[in-house]
Amino acid sequence: MGEESQAAGLPSSPPPHPLSADSSLSPADGKGTPDPSRGITRRLTFPLLSVTLLVSFGSSMLYGYNLAVVNSPAVHIKDFYNATWSQRYGHGLAPGPLTLLYSLTVSTFALGGLGGSLLVGLLVARYGRRGTLSRSSLLVLLAGGFMGFSRELGSPEMVIIGRSITGLHAGICLSVVPLYLGEIAPKNLRGFLGLMPSIFICLGVFSAQVLGLPELLGKERYWPLFLAVVVVPASLQLLLLHCFPESPRYLLIEKNDVCGATEALRRFLGMPDVQDAVQEMKEEQRSLSSVETTSVGQLLRDRAVRWQTLSVAVVNAGMQLSGIDAIWFYTNTIFENAGIPRSQIPYTTVGTGAIEVVAGLIGCFTIEKLGRRPLIITGFCAMGVCSAGITLCLLLQTALPWMRYVAVACVVGIIAGFCMGPAGVPFLMTAELFTQSHRPAAYVLGGSLNWLCNFTIGFIFPFLQMSAGAFCYLVFCGVCLLVALYVHLVVPETKNKTFVEISRTFAARRAVLPACRGATLKLRGYGALEGSLEGSGSGSGLGSGLGLGSGSELGSGLGSGSGLGLESGLGSGLGSRSGFA
């Protein structure tokens, strides 16, 4: 009755939700409107921090490690391929086929990732979020065995197969980790915890650069072990992840396990009384019973969310077409072309890796203050300018030897710009731009584009570099600047905004209907799916506002039945699926 009285404009003071950053209502205004000054900021509990660090270390970090692990031992891997080919067929490989085989080794990681991203929906529905992450660790153990014993068995195919399996694992985890963290994170910590995996991606790259030093695993005899080190974080996650609860939303809404969800909430929040959160998820469960999950095909055909869909496609494709993977895969080659002595290159790359981690930390600790748009726009602009700078440096380094050091600075700028924003914000934006019914399809679409572009860049960059020379980086410059311009013109800021407000912004751009002027009622939502409804009584048409029915979180009722149904954007139909997850 508390929510209904608020919708009717009556004063009420419901108990604050334990997870909402702004769930308290001001009793003094007499209208039940949110008062941000009286908002409740949820503290970061030890279980929340621990599980975030564990899945970031055991899953996200492996993605960064596998991106950079083929960089240092590239010469040794090519020598192994050449020697094996000579033993089998009596002659070595020509430079062209050898480059093709090595490019396949690099890019098959992305092909596996593409396959993994397509399996995410099926896996999380069957095994849950935590269960999917635990089972995916077994893939890493299998891949480590293939790559670790490849030289002993004289099989280059085992290296390629192992790389594809690690890609399969990465494709699964890049979507499941933010999904899991988003469902267990309080609203005021969603951005902070959501960018934590991107820090570990940078840390994975840094770890590969350090272990690839000649004093450690960079020697010729150690490269199979260097590739197989991934089994260590995966084993740790496999052993410890079962100590933490499954996602409460998954347990209650999808498995109808009220007791399990209650216990999980108590563990994550560190408080005994979680009945408000449980009741709220029950209301969401009842509302979702009438909502059908959208497929990728339906998502692409739905004109009501075409700008959201295009935005997710642009930022995910731009994330890879920016050339960051070319920088990570071929850092040694870039530095060698820039004139850095070969003996100094491994130490130079380690320095860039340390800067990556620092840049990731800056983005993680500033996203809740600066917002999503400034981080991603600044990051892409920095990457574009530095890509053009690399071209300029490579062209002038013969006449101006000091330009080689500017080229190194440009590489550092590209990596730092990427880690500050574009590395993690696209995954966060996918959750925030879509409602519950559209979100799984959006993750499949964004993840597929991400990995497809990853494969394309990893495969064609060596040939692009051979044909275009220094000018190949101008392609990446153009992509980065275009993505930054698109985000500036189209994508709204989503920090501290409800899904109604975000979708209303997109609806105004589509000019489907005028912006609604109803009072906003912020419900005390949980995790990444907190929503709100526009409360105005019983709407009777497009111009009269939105009718609030039973007061459930997703707005399963529409007043007298003549209000406007909402899902993932205004103007998607009258009396259709309603509310925001």
Model regions: which residues?
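Short intracellular "coupling" helices and adjacent cytoplasmic loop segments at the cytosolic face
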Residues: 267-277
